[in-house]
């Protein structure tokens, strides 16, 4: 909505400027500009929809006596919500910084004569890691008093330490209760805010670089997949894979288990389906004028197919969360009831009422009706005329049998209403799989019938989208005996793929190869064990023998390998066994980057900051332990000489050969006022100096955690004159004023950009290619991170094209990350 509005604004403004008349005429005709925008031609959307009110009042989704509060809440702007992400130790430091610095500065602050409301924690989110505030984006950007807080939010969001996420969208991952060993599927993942929550749960223990579990994040929209990649990259996890498929027909994947291929079933599945979004009216005001019941009627079938496919891929005992940002029972309880009915007891709704203390919710509906967009009601399927059968389906109604309805326990679904805790509207249902789905049940063999002589048939790699239940006429009609889902899938695929004639009936035609749409991705090529590229790396960094070198991969089959990426062994298993079944957009983290003249330093590859936390536990050489004062110097100065660092650091660095190094800070528990989380940085040991290769936003993050505030670029430009004066007469060494100007206000110096060798030729070997220097996590600087033809701007603006001038990337904090 917002992008389309901006696209139409320019021609209208030009037309208004050409129109003659006074200021008063312009005000009436739409030519006068005020602080909120153009007055004419863009009337505010009236937040009323009689059909909406009639529909939900009739369904009684709101408790008696609360309707007015419900509607008033829908008309109010949605509070801004932020969630602290990342490893737990780092998250605690950010929380400490927020509470003791930024929030305290807001306590007595007034903007335009109004007292600023201090952010408050969400009562139901664990460990106070989620906060909400009524501060609007306009106030944050325009108020000088809030500039530091705004820059903090923007910078920390870019570096992935804070997520601007709608409060209710944080609920589904929490109810999944994912553990580090779980195999997790996110079926409709873009833009990725919930996916990042799941990744954080995998890495709950910071000391384990490779959790046993992984996340496969899928989205049907190819362009939105790249936004999903950008979100996931911030967390630098080797356990995330982004794929591009229709969620309703996700391919069956396989894994090698003890030399035998087995179907991959997931321990946790997040099924956050596309929906009409009428629970987002507070944020997406377009819904007020566009809402009809037709949207729900059209989406119901797709939602049910996606949920069914998810249930098929869930392991027995696993948990699946179905969620929408819609209040309509056609998209909510009707889908769950239909899924439970067709599962014949294989699925059941879990009681999660006690899992999020402090969350206010309403129980799911057990009775509802269907209404057409012209206001006609149908209480049951039998009342629907023949002419409406293509639009209205039997699965949209509650079950007829009262006992079956009661056994479903639809009241265990959670309905979140906006006026209860100042949120958006939301629906969540948690399903647990108790047994195989009914179409996966093995028919009993008649007595005396020999076993199947064909033997086990391996699934065909050319059948990526087969997801329909096997025909009972083929598998048998007596579902008394039950086999596991894996056995059922293997048997069904064996029958499907057997082309021989039986009883005069030909087998099905051979499956066609899966068609891939969107950008053609570079291949994922694992490095063979005998590759001569790895031994110099292993020797230079003294890698531990337990280092999983088989998990290293590149994105090229020809020429020099410029970057090395790493995945967990479980994702390696998935990649190797499903190359023809799925379209992988991205996986793995960058751990090494080639330096063309690196042979002079005994190793052609230098460390990449993106993967340093994954690599560090295996590195036994090239490690320099630094103090917190050293970290401040390394992050605020371009190439500090050894003599500027502490004597302990100098003694470690002076005898070390030139090349890539690890800079490690260990917190001192006896000094609680200092930074209490470990820091690992990658750097370069030059002839007489050390530099760090850390992205700018990550530098700012660490500096803030150490109590230093770096002012914004805008502030530096506005104070250019004062900056030059300060640079001309800096404080003398030991002078407290000079030290404060250097530490508290490093606006007078440019923070060193990650991987900018041009500013220090001595630090980069002669003949090296600047493009080879690691560039942090900015895809615009690393062509290998972005597919051919895909620019950084297109990551931030999926679906848009540049008009005229070169596009400018919009900060990720300005993007919608509510769902």
Report each predicted region and the residues it spans:
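Conserved SAM-binding loop of SAM-dependent methyltransferases across substrates and taxa
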Residues: 191-210
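Class I S-adenosyl-L-methionine
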Residues: 74, 84-182, 201, 348-376, 412-416
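Conserved class I S-adenosyl-L-methionine
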Residues: 181-190
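Mobile active-site "lid"/loop adjacent to the S-adenosyl-L-methionine
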Residues: 222-223, 247, 261-309, 313-317, ...
């Amino acid at each position: 909505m917002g992008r389309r509005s901006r696209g139409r604004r320019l021609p209208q403004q030009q037309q208004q400027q050409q129109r003659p008349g006074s200021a008063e005429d312009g005000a009436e005709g739409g030519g006068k500009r005020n602080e909120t925008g153009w007055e004419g031609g863009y009337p505010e959307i009236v937040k009323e929809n009689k059909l909406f009110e009639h529909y939900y009042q009739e369904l009684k989704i709101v408790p008696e006596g609360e309707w007015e509060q419900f509607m008033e809440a829908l008309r109010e702007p949605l509070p801004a919500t932020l969630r602290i992400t990342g490893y737990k130790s780092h998250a605690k430091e950010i929380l400490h910084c927020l509470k003791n610095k930024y929030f305290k500065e807001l306590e007595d602050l007034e903007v335009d004569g109004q007292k600023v409301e201090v952010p408050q924690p969400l009562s139901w989110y664990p460990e106070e890691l989620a906060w909400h505030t009524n501060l609007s984006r306009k106030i944050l950007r325009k108020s000088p008093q809030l500039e530091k807080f705004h820059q903090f939010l923007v910078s920390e969001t870019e570096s992935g330490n804070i997520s601007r996420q709608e409060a209710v969208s944080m609920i589904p991952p929490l109810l999944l209760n994912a553990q580090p060993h779980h195999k997790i599927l996110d079926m409709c993942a873009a833009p990725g805010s919930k996916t990042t929550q799941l990744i954080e749960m995998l890495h709950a223990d910071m000391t384990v670089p490779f959790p046993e579990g992984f996340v496969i994040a899928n989205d049907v929209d190819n362009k939105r997949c790249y936004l999903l990649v950008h979100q996931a990259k911030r967390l630098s996890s080797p356990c995330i894979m982004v794929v591009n498929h229709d969620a309703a027909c996700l391919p069956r994947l396989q894994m090698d288990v003890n030399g035998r291929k087995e179907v991959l079933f997931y321990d946790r599945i997040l099924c956050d389906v596309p929906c009409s979004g009428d629970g987002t009216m507070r944020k997406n005001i377009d819904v007020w004028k566009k809402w009809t019941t037709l949207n729900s009627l059209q989406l119901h079938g797709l939602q049910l197919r996606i949920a069914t496919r998810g249930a098929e891929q869930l392991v027995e005992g696993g948990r699946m969360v179905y969620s929408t940002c819609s209040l309509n029972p056609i998209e909510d309880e009707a889908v769950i009831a239909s899924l439970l009915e067709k599962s014949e007891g294989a699925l059941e709704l879990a009681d999660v009422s006690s899992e999020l203390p402090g969350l206010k919710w309403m129980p799911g509906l057990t009775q509802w009706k269907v209404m057409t967009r012209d206001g006609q009601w149908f209480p049951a399927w039998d009342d629907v005329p023949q002419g409406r059968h293509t639009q209205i389906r039997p699965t949209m109604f509650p079950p007829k049998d009262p006992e079956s309805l009661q056994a479903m326990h639809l009241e265990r679904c959670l309905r979140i209403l906006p006026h209860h805790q100042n949120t958006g509207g939301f629906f969540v249902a948690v399903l647990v799989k108790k047994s195989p789905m009914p179409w996966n049940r093995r028919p009993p063999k008649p007595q005396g019938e020999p076993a199947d002589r064909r033997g086990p048939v391996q699934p065909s790699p050319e059948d990526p989208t087969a997801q329909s239940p096997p025909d009972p006429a083929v598998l048998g009609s007596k579902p008394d005996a039950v086999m596991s889902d894996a056995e059922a899938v293997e048997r069904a695929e064996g029958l499907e793929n057997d082309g021989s004639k039986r009883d005069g009936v030909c087998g099905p035609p051979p499956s066609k190869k899966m068609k891939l749409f969107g950008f053609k991705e570079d291949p994922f090529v694992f490095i063979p064990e005998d590759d001569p590229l790895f031994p110099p790396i292993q020797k230079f960094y003294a890698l531990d023998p337990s280092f999983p070198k088989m998990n290293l991969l590149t994105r090229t089959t020809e020429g020099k390998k410029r970057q090395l990426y790493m995945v967990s062994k479980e994702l390696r298993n998935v990649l190797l066994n499903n190359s023809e079944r799925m379209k992988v957009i991205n996986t793995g983290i960058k751990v090494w980057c080639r330096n063309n003249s690196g042979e002079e330093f005994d190793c052609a590859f230098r460390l990449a900051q993106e993967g340093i936390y994954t690599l560090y536990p295996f590195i036994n050489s090239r490690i320099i332990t630094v103090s917190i004062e050293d970290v401040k110097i390394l992050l605020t100065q371009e190439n500090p000489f050894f003599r500027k660092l502490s004597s302990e650091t100098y003694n470690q660095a002076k005898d070390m050969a030139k090349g890539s190094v690890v800079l490690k800070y260990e917190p001192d528990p006896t000094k609680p006022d200092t930074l209490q989380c470990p820091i690992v940085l990658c750097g370069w040991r030059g002839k007489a100096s050390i530099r760090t290769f850390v992205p700018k936003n990550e530098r700012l993050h660490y500096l803030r955690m150490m109590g230093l505030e770096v002012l914004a670029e805008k502030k530096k430009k506005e104070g250019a004159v004062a900056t030059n004066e300060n640079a001309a007469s800096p404080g003398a060494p030991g002078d407290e004023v000079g030290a404060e100007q250097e530490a508290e206000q490093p606006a007078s110096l440019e923070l060193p950009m990650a991987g900018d060798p041009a500013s220090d030729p001595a630090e980069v070997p002669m003949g090296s290619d600047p493009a080879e220097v690691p560039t942090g996590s900015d895809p615009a600087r690393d062509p290998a991170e972005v597919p051919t033809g895909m620019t950084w701007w297109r990551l931030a603006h999926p679906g848009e094209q540049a008009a005229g001038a070169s596009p400018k990337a919009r900060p990720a904090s300005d993007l919608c990350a509510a769902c």
